Amino acid sequence: LHRDFLYDAKMRGVDWKAARDKYAPLVERVTDRAELNDVLGMMVAEVGALHSQIRPGELRRTEQEGAPAGLGAVLARTNEGYRVEHVYRSEAELPSARAPLSRPEVDVKEGDVITAVNGKDVLGARDISDLLLNQADKQVLLQVKRGNGKGAPRAVIVTPVNMAKQTALRYGDWELSRAEQVAAASQGRIGYLHLRAMGANDIASFARDFYANINREGLIIDVRRNNGGNIDSWIIEKLLRKAWAYWAPPGVQPSSNMQNTFRGHLVVLVDELTYSDGETFAAGIKALKLAPLVGKRTAGAGVWLSDNTRLADNGMARVAENGQFGIDGQWLIEGVGVVPDVEVDNPPHATFNGGDRQLEVALDMLAKKLKEQPRPAFQAQPIPALK
């Protein structure tokens, strides 16, 4: 498959037949599909293409002992029970995406203490997570008492979520904290949006957050940890739109034509986990000189793949097929990543404690830009009287 579909017909200078001969003897020692995946993966790694991945087909799977679930909150064990330290927040416009403990029918506040789950004392268990095993999407009865000590303990019905949703809730809470930091530091002059990936959900996320910030004087687009997809051109097209005129109905703030154009200053955040289409987006921003990039060099996965290379057992040996080069003919991204204009590291200890040096630098850059080049206001000349 790699011989026939890899973006470089010369196999990056690798003798592919010799690579096959090198790993073929290991096939006789393979006992299951997982071991075959290892052999295939080692052989594919010889060509050093990041978008070449092995996906298993049919595997023997052990029966799961228990699927963990969460309440969408940070809990701390105390001598009374589990105190609700923080409930993960979500977009106000997406009520269905709320954390279990933040839903309107659930009367639990930060500081409250959970004392029992389905009638079992939480302090009698190794951890509250043991009592939530296999409870995702099922109604669970909590015994909760107020953190201020007032009132009798009460029963609360809540529906936990699986770990994928728990992780997404935590991620969303982090996104909101970044947006709040930007709004507070800039007195509302600068907006913020984060793109987790470049897929269908991220189209909705971008549309919701970008147009809400369309009239800000500055904007930070954060693609750190972005794991790719295929919407970079769609986003860049929105950023390329320019206002050339303004509609001015009586008593209403003028609006631009082209419609929904962002007229402010822009900064894009990247890091070493910005991957695939997140990198293509960053490369496009840099090539078109739309904004400075701040952060760390990206992962270097610049050759895209397809899912057309399925195997007999429905597994897949994904091949990096679609290389990309710039208008100067130079190959882009693969193996080298996208280098930021301003390199900034996030120190681990400070980051663990809530710091975000990369975001702070982006804010400082925009504040300086707004001072040096303030965005011109909509200002029409007086309408001439009829002669």
Residue ranges and their predicted role:
Residues V361, M365-K387:
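Gram-negative outer-membrane assembly/targeting C-terminal domains
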Residues L50-S96:
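PDZ/PDZ-like peptide-tail recognition elements
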Residues M43, L193, Q330, A362:
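A residue-level signal for conserved active-site and pocket-lining positions in enzyme catalytic cores
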Residues K109-V113:
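Structural motif
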Residues A179-E180, T274-S276, A312-E343:
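Metal-dependent DNA phosphodiester-chemistry modules and their immediately adjacent helices/loops
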Residues E343-A350:
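C-terminal or mid-to-C-terminal helical accessory/interaction module adjacent to the motor/catalytic core
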Residues H2-Y7, M11, R83, E91-L101, ...:
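Cleft-lining beta-strand/loop regions that shape enzyme active-site pockets
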Residues L1-Q53, R77-R83, E93, P376, ...:
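Terminal targeting/pro-maturation regions of precursor/exported proteins
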